[in-house]
A protein has these predicted regions:
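AMP-forming adenylation/ATP pyrophosphatase catalytic core
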Residues: 2, 6-36, 54-58, 64, ...
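Core alpha/beta nucleotide-donor-binding catalytic domains of modification enzymes
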Residues: 2-208
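Non-catalytic, surface-exposed connector residues within folded enzymatic/regulatory domains
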Residues: 71, 100, 199, 216-219, ...
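Residues that cap or delimit alpha-helices
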Residues: 174, 212, 273-274
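Mid-to-C-terminal catalytic subdomains of enzymes
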Residues: 181, 185-227, 314, 327-332, ...
């Protein structure tokens, strides 16, 4: 991208944004009507017109049913898509809406509907219009939550979701360049007041960005931080993969490691770096638990408890560690974790008994 964040995106730069998608059979463009997504649609249409052969483009607008203006905005997107020669669909999020956690629920519904639209269109990718500004906001949100390296890596350019690749071709592009591009082309766009609603976290953080920028913490810097942490995260993931292989080799294939259970030799596990041990636990709990992803903070507490239990077992001598009775046993995110017989065991936690079961036959 150009160093001038207020200059329109050139034809050449736009080609680079979409170049890796040329061989896709079809693409779904997620377009709400705001400036970022309208720019995505306009740039993608211009790129596609320059190809002799390329993917079929389908524009999809999700109406969450949360604002009366949304239906009108969807119709305007349809008009713009038609002018660009693109197919358009409007999908609606139906049913009751939650009273808390509305942004997250709306996001999940949107991605679910987009994945359905992609499968119907034979598309391999769904393209969203996340920008460098969005990346900076995401980094701030996760920093305030106390996220680890993986969380602070924020959004990736490509992510697999529900069997569809979620692509973010504008992730390195500032919002100001997209607006400049639309103004140069005299293309209109909608203004969603939700983006300024201080009842939600992201708009509040967005309002702080100018003050952070004045201190050197602008969107470019925060996005660069995210990219560097993503690089570090990828390296730690490779180390964790190697650690899993190391632990399996130590067991010579005798210990369970699969869909039903995981088991690690405690002394070998203890020799690994703390971050790698955390990720091994997270992977096993997420794979075998039935209550969703485990929280990093809770797994950190679990690891501390395991370390203390292993140290206590070592101090008590080999007899205490070999008697087979659990030294530690707890559930987390639907998984059962125990330390017994010198091994860490992780498997699905027993399902809670229903009231009918408690009453007996």
């Amino acid at each position: 991208m150009s160093d001038d964040d207020n200059s329109p995106i050139s034809v050449r730069a736009a080609k680079q944004l979409f170049a890796e998608l040329k061989a896709a059979p079809a693409l779904v463009l997620a377009v709400s009507g705001g400036p970022d997504s309208v720019a995505l649609m306009w740039l993608a249409a211009r790129w596609r017109r320059g190809l002799a052969r390329g993917p079929q483009l389908t524009v999809v607008t999700v109406d969450h049913g949360l604002r009366p203006e949304a239906a009108r905005e969807a119709r305007e997107v349809k008009r713009q898509a038609t002018e660009l020669g693109l197919t358009h669909r409007t999908l609606r999020w139906r049913g009751a809406k939650p009273t808390t956690g509305l942004p997250a629920a709306a996001r999940e519904a949107r991605y679910r509907l987009l994945a359905q639209a992609a499968r119907a269109a034979g598309a391999s990718h769904v393209l969203t219009a996340h920008t460098r500004d969005d990346q900076a906001e995401t980094v701030l949100m996760r920093l305030l939550r106390g996220s680890g390296i993986a969380g602070l890596s924020a959004m990736a350019r490509l992510t697999m979701r529900d069997g569809i690749v979620l692509a973010r071709p504008l992730l390195d592009v500032p919002k100001s360049q997209l607006i400049a591009t639309l103004r140069r082309a005299k293309v209109g766009f909608a203004d969603d007041p939700t983006n300024r609603n201080a009842a939600f976290t992201r708009p509040r953080l967005r309002a702080l960005l100018p003050q952070l920028a004045a201190e050197g913490g602008d969107a470019r810097t925060l996005a660069r931080l995210s990219a560097r942490l993503a690089r570090a995260n990828a390296a730690v993931e490779v180390l964790t993969d190697g650690a899993e292989r190391f632990l399996r080799l130590r067991d010579r294939g005798d210990a369970p490691h699969g869909a039903a259970a995981r088991s690690f030799e405690a002394t070998a596990f203890a020799t690994l770096p703390e971050e790698v041990r955390l990720r091994l636990l997270l992977r096993a709990i997420d794979a075998l638990g039935h209550e969703g992803p485990a929280e990093l903070g809770k797994v950190e507490t679990l690891l501390t408890a395991l370390d203390q239990a292993m140290a206590a077992g070592t101090a008590a001598g080999p007899r205490a560690s070999a008697n087979g009775r659990p030294v530690l046993k707890q559930t987390m995110a639907g998984a059962l974790i125990s330390l017994a017989g010198g091994r860490i065991h992780i498997g699905p936690a027993p399902a809670p008994r229903s009231k009918g079961d408690l009453k007996g036959g």
